[in-house]
């Protein structure tokens, strides 16, 4: 396994651990999710280029589109929560209340 793939795999696992560790703030969780999506994008791009898959060359672009949609939905949720409650603590949110 090349060194760049090992580094990207470590970046993915570090960002995934960041989601688990920093789950008290919504902004920190969103940043860690963006890190995972970025490392997944780079890994799929490198694997597509190295293995010469012509049919799956659109897979990184599709992943990037899903990452942009995830970021937009996350930011909309962050703005809504911070306008409603005044802070972005996930622990203070209760989904049972309407």
UniProtKB/Swiss-Prot annotation:
One of its GO terms (molecular function) is NADH dehydrogenase (ubiquinone) activity. Gene3D superfamilies: 1.10.287.3510. This is NADH-ubiquinone oxidoreductase chain 4L. Keywords: Electron transport, Membrane, Mitochondrion, Mitochondrion inner membrane, NAD, Respiratory chain, Translocase, Transmembrane, Transmembrane helix, Transport, Ubiquinone. Belongs to the complex I subunit 4L family. Disulfide bonds: none annotated. Its main location: mitochondrion. Pfam families: Oxidored_q2 (PF00420). One of its GO terms (cellular component) is respiratory chain complex I. Core subunit of respiratory chain NADH dehydrogenase (Complex I) which is composed of 45 different subunits. It is found in: Mitochondrion inner membrane. Core subunit of the mitochondrial membrane respiratory chain NADH dehydrogenase (Complex I) which catalyzes electron transfer from NADH through the respiratory chain, using ubiquinone as an electron acceptor. Part of the enzyme membrane arm which is embedded in the lipid bilayer and involved in proton translocation. It catalyses: a ubiquinone + NADH + 5 H(+)(in) = a ubiquinol + NAD(+) + 4 H(+)(out). One of its GO terms (biological process) is ATP synthesis coupled electron transport. It is a multi-pass membrane protein. The keyword ATP-binding does not apply. The chain crosses the membrane at residues 2-22, 26-46, 59-79. Its EC number is 7.1.1.2. InterPro entries: NADH_UbQ_OxRdtase_chain4L/K, NUOK/Mnh_C1-like. PANTHER family: NADH-UBIQUINONE OXIDOREDUCTASE CHAIN 4L, NADH-UBIQUINONE OXIDOREDUCTASE SUBUNIT ND4L.
């Amino acid at each position: 396994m090349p060194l760049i793939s090992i580094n990207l795999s470590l970046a993915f696992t570090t960002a995934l651990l960041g989601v688990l560790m920093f789950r008290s703030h919504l902004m920190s969780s969103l940043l860690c999710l963006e890190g995972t999506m970025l490392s997944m994008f780079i890994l799929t791009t490198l694997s597509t280029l190295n293995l010469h898959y012509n049919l799956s060359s659109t897979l990184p672009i599709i992943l990037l589109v899903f990452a942009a949609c995830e970021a937009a939905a996350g930011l909309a949720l962050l703005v809504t929560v911070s306008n409603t409650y005044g802070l972005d603590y996930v622990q203070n949110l209760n989904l049972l209340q309407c």
